[in-house]
Amino acid sequence: AEAVFRTVPVAPLVTTGLLVLPTLADATAALPALVDAGLATIELLDATSLRVAQTLSDAPAAITDLTVDRHAALLVEVHATTDAELADGAARLEALAAGLPRAAPFALTRELAARAALWHVRKGLYPAVAEARPSGTTALLEDIAVPVANLLPTCEALEALFARHGYESAV
């Protein structure tokens, strides 16, 4: 037997940030420019996700200090192999972020504990929601992929579907 692995190299240098925006529409509108900037990671968190994240013990101030209404956030990362590449990618991201309608201060960090806390927010959402569900109910977990242009209407349709069927705290 034979196998061929097409692996992706892991860049040794990473900076991570959480870009909090007033609405899901603002977050999805920012995506094309962020993708074009060459970000390694862009993870979307909707308002429900942010509310759940506020219950996590190590949630950053950008989330805990927020009075969540229709907000959304983007967990973003720049990866690089040299300090110069990382500085260039971070500068591009910060310039883009400066032009967006941010709902909280934006900062990038290379510090491992701060980066881990940001990722704990993202990765801790499903367990937090599942744990809080009433006895006898099930938490659903399904990743979907849609073209960026369809992301906002897809998210809005899912929110409406969950509301219509009384499925609360869907992330």
Show where each model-derived region lies.
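Noncatalytic alpha-helical scaffold of FAD-dependent oxidoreductases
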Residues: 1-171
